[in-house]
């Protein structure tokens, strides 16, 4: 098109990077949205309650790893966890699920594998980091602090009961939820891709390099970026890989870990469902563990 001939080369480069990120991430967003829709309809708190172990440690581990079997996008995880808590699933089981389900599920792990050039390195770093955070939160809630974390006057989180619907109705609701999920997460992907592309083209390399030289500063910057961008976990690896050359391994791992656990949209939903004291404990504990973990990753490179 003739209009592109009049655009500066920097704009064209930015558009090329922007579109490449979108095209790479879109299939995973679509697959994740469809899966999220079926999880919303078919996975009930009663099913989770049925298979809970009897002891606390077992329940903490169950909450940590069940996300691999019953994955859920972080965009809809808070209402699901709130429903679990209302059904008397212990907080030390539900909150580890909140932390790991958007990260350890097969779609996100495969997206991470694909985004980083078919490398298992970031898959394992992301997986182990999420497990460490989840188990730590479970121990905190199970043995140290008051486990009652739901607001007494919490507003409903729009978790619908589909158990009495007919089979075709369940499929319809699952697909309808998938469409909503796709449009909801798509806007964050577009915004995140634009920011990542713009940073690579318009932010002077010397500034980014100076930030990247200080490991702690780089980790904090990437955590803040993940919080602001509020990307879906199926897509954040594609943003992370575009910033790898600038910031390095440890800050990108921090970006991949904190985003699905603590971002703007999640915080707003948590504020609606959970006590402020718990939210501060969750954010503080998660952030501190991720910082320490990523500093260790940086030293071990």
Curated annotation (Swiss-Prot):
One of its GO terms (cellular component) is plasma membrane. The chain crosses the membrane at residues 15-35, 60-80, 97-117, 124-144, 188-208, 211-231, 238-258, 278-298. The keyword Transmembrane applies. Keywords: Amino-acid transport, Cell membrane, Membrane, Transmembrane, Transmembrane helix, Transport. GO terms for biological process: amino acid transport. It is a multi-pass membrane protein. Disruption phenotype: SMU_746c-SMU_747c deletion affects biofilm formation in a medium- and pH-dependent manner. Mutants show a reduced ability to grow in acidified medium, but they survive both short-term or long-term acid stress. Mutants have lower glycolytic activity. Deletion does not affect membrane proton permeability. It comes from the Bacteria. Belongs to the UPF0718 family. Could be part of a two-component membrane permease system responsible for amino acid transport under low pH. Involved in acidogenesis, biofilm formation and low-pH survival. Interacts with SMU_746c. This is Putative two-component membrane permease complex subunit SMU_747c. It comes from Streptococcus mutans serotype c (strain ATCC 700610 / UA159). The lineage of its organism: Bacteria, Bacillati, Bacillota, Bacilli, Lactobacillales.
């Amino acid at each position: 098109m003739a209009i592109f001939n009049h655009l500066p080369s920097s704009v064209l480069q930015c558009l090329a990077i922007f579109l490449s990120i979108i095209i790479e991430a879109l299939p995973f967003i679509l697959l994740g949205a469809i899966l999220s829709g079926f999880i919303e309809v078919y996975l009930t708190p009663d099913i989770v309650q049925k298979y809970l172990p009897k002891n606390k440690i077992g329940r903490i581990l169950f909450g940590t790893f069940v996300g691999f079997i019953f994955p859920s996008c972080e965009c809809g995880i808070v209402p699901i966890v709130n429903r679990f808590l209302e059904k008397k699933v212990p907080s030390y089981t539900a909150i580890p699920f909140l932390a790991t389900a958007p990260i350890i599920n097969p779609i996100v792990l495969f997206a991470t594998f694909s985004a980083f050039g078919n490398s298992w390195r970031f898959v394992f770093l992301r997986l182990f980091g999420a497990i460490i955070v989840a188990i730590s939160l479970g121990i905190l809630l199970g043995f140290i602090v008051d486990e009652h974390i739901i607001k007494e006057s919490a507003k409903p989180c729009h978790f619908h009961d589909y158990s009495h619907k007919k089979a075709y109705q369940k499929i319809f609701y699952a697909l309808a939820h998938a469409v909503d999920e796709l449009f909801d997460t798509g806007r964050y992907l577009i915004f995140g891709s634009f920011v990542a592309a713009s940073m690579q083209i318009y932010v002077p390399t010397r500034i980014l390099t100076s930030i990247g030289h200080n490991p702690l500063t780089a980790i904090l910057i990437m955590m803040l970026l993940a919080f602001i961008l509020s990307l879906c976990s199926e897509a954040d690896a594609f943003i992370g890989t575009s910033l790898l050359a600038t910031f390095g391994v440890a800050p990108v791992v921090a970006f991949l870990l904190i985003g699905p656990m603590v971002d703007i949209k999640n915080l707003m939903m948590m504020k609606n469902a959970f006590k402020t004291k718990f939210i501060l404990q969750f954010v503080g504990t998660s952030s501190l563990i991720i910082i320490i973990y990523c500093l260790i990753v940086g030293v071990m490179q």
